[in-house]
Amino acid sequence: MKYAISSESMKLSDEKTIKSGVSAIELMDRASHALFCVAREIGANNIAVVCGSGNNGGDGYALSLKLLDSGRQVQVYGKIPKTQSAMYYYDILMDKYSERFCPIEKMQSLESFDLVVDCLLGIGIIGQLSAEYASYIDKINTGKYIVSCDIPSGLNSDNGKKSPVSVIANRTIAVQSYKTGHFLADGKDVCGKLEICDIGIEIFGKKYFIVDSKFVKNCFSIKLNNSHKGDYGRCGIVACSENFVGAGKLAFASSTSILGESAMRVGCGYCYLFVPQKMLPYMWGEVTHSCIFSHKDLDNHKLDSIAFGMGIGDNPKLCEKVFRVQCEKIIDADAINYLAKNKDSLKKLKGCVLTPHPMEFSRLTGLSVQEILSNPIEIAEQFAKDNNLIVVLKGATSIITNGEQTYLNTSGCSGQAKGGSGDVLSGIIGSLLAQKIPAFEAAVAGCYIAGKTAEIVADKSSVYSMLPVDIATSVGNTLSSILKDKIWVYYVNKLKIEWFLQINYEIMHFLE
């Protein structure tokens, strides 16, 4: 499974590799070879390489030598290196090709080059860039095609935030491992096509795994022919407020029905929608695939999971009522806002799934949104650990953690930035919980399913026109593509067993 690491882990791994006997000069040579292969693949002959004063710049100087030795037209813009290994390649460049070097301060627009290779800043950047470096980045961004070494310059490699500008790359060649900043915040918008170059560094430190279809496939069991709806769980969805009036009731009835549909399409046996008594007449015309009850009926039904909080408004009694129900839970929206004001109630939700967006998480933690986005993984991990919960911190890349394990879900698209998309996610996770999939795995798989389905929908329509209901109705396409191999293998194995039993029977019959 693919994974990302922090800048601290990368530096530690780098240091251990050098101590093991592989020199920093050799590592730069390997990284520059990977960049050279990319330049050769692109077919560029007129190339600008922009080098900073650190080891990222050293990769650039080593690359420049390879490009010039191969006969390509290269202009090198750079600063004098501050590290010995980078200085090694800088000195060779100045001995052999000094006429191809220009101080970075004299760099102008790079629009005339076929390829610009960004080796300005590496993973060590912290805080705001100076005006000087911001101007360098602006000039790099004039390039026709930009390849960044390890991380686009100006992007924080841990939290993915621009500082406040960054190179906008067409391709980013991550050295040895993805960094968390490649995926968080602005990372997905500025990295372009992401690739890893293996330069022989063993990774130490924590790994943040990136959810894939194989993980999701392993969460599901085969639906046997000899089974019934009770085998696949009862998912309860407790939503809606009686304070909606007029057209608002109709709108929310439609939204709540999407929750039920997303739950059923992921495979639970039953879905029960619990809404205020006054909303029942509006629900009857909208819902065709779920049973509908009032909030008052919640105690009368045995449930395997509850998805709760969507559109309930300020309703303390309902919150406490739901928290007392003994089953798996996913808590979202207004129920999270209730917990922010009543933190003692978190003790009643051990092992449950919380799905806040950054503003809701800000209310829960007491930290500002800016503080959270500056260090989202560690803050989410600590909150989950302190409260024995599973946290899904939603974003362009969602962070799913139980305090010990942390996954990054990179599936999804900007078309999910619409009201109701979070409701679909809640329904999906609620359904997985009802099917007895452990809470952490259900949260991880649910995020991937929702995001992957959104990508499929966007391909067929657009990120502008797609609606949350489109995701709910299209979940089957995603599950079909993920699970078809699992089902095929199951039946192949079944046939093998039947064949073995038949052969064994015939042998025994012959011996008799």
Model-derived regions, located:
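Rossmann-like NAD(P)-binding element
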Residues: 115-128, 308-314
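Short, conserved loop/turn and helix-capping segments at secondary-structure boundaries
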Residues: 87, 131-134, 163-166, 374, ...
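Nucleotide and nucleotide-moiety/phosphate-recognizing core
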Residues: 36-119, 128-149
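Internal gly/pro-rich beta-alpha loop/helix module
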Residues: 120-207
